[in-house]
Amino acid sequence: MTTLFISDLHLDPSRPEITDLFLRFLREQAPGADALYILGDLFEAWIGDDTPSPAADAVADALKVLSDSGVPVYFIRGNRDFLLGEDYARRAGLRILPDPCMIDLYGRPVLLQHGDLLCTDDIPYQQFRAQTRDPAFQAQFLSQPLAARIAFAQKAREASQARQSEMKQGDRAQFETVTDVAPSEVDATFARHGVDTMIHGHTHRPAIHSLQAGGRACTRIVLGDWYEQGSVLRVDAGGWSLDTLARE
C-alpha cells in the first residue's frame, strides 16, 4: 500500500486547470491509498469557511468521497489557507493536524509541516505569521463582514507581491536565500524532534535532500507546487518517489 503527500496546489478560480487536475488525481490515483496528506496551501487564499465558492465546494465534495471510501485525508494549514476551519474540514472529510506534527510512516517516525516555519531568514514574514496565527487576531478578522475580509486579503496580497517583486529586482541570490529554508533551522528542527526524516512543502523547490544533522544521516523531502504540473510524493514500506502529474 502507498501513502500520498501533496502541497501547494494554490487552487483558485483563475486557474481551473489545476483544480481539474486535482479532481482527476482524487478520482484516479488516490482511491485505495493508505492515506492522503495535504501539507498546506491547498487554496490560493482562504478568508473564512463562509466564503461562497463553487470551486471549493467541488473540491470538498471530491475529498469527502475519498474520505468516505476509507482513505483518511489529513490537512496541515499553509500560509495561504491558515484560516481554513472546522466547518469546511467537516464538509470535506479532512482531519486537521497541527504544524508541525509527527506521524509513524511504515515504522519510521516522520515530521510533517507546511514548511514556512523553516524560512527563518525571512524575518518580516515570520512576524506576519506570528500575528496572523494568533487566535485573537483570527477571531477578530473572521468576525468582520465578508466584504471587509475580501478587501483586507486583496491589500495583503498586493503588498506581498510588491515585496516579492522588489526583492527579485534587488539581490537575486539574497532573494533565493530568504525564500528558502534556513539550514540552521533545518538542523535545529531535526534535533528538536529527534527524527531523521522530514516532509514539507511551501518553498516550491521539489527535491529529496540527504544531509547530516547533529551527526545523523537525515532526509528532507520537499514537495512541489502544482502551477505547471502536479507533484505527489508516494511512500510505501520500501521507500519513496517524488513524481509529477501531467495535465490532460
Curated annotation (Swiss-Prot):
Protein name: UDP-2,3-diacylglucosamine hydrolase
Species name: Stenotrophomonas maltophilia (strain K279a)
Domain of life, per lineage: Bacteria
Gene Ontology biological-process annotations: lipid A biosynthetic process
Enzyme Commission code(s) on record: 3.6.1.54
Binding site for Mn(2+) 1: D8, H10, D41, H204
Reactions this protein catalyses: UDP-2-N,3-O-bis[(3R)-3-hydroxytetradecanoyl]-alpha-D-glucosamine + H2O = 2-N,3-O-bis[(3R)-3-hydroxytetradecanoyl]-alpha-D-glucosaminyl 1-phosphate + UMP + 2 H(+)
Location(s), subcellular: Cell inner membrane
Cofactors that this protein relies on: Mn(2+)
Listed PANTHER family: UDP-2,3-DIACYLGLUCOSAMINE HYDROLASE, UDP-2,3-DIACYLGLUCOSAMINE HYDROLASE-RELATED
Gene Ontology cellular-component annotations: cytoplasm; extrinsic component of plasma membrane
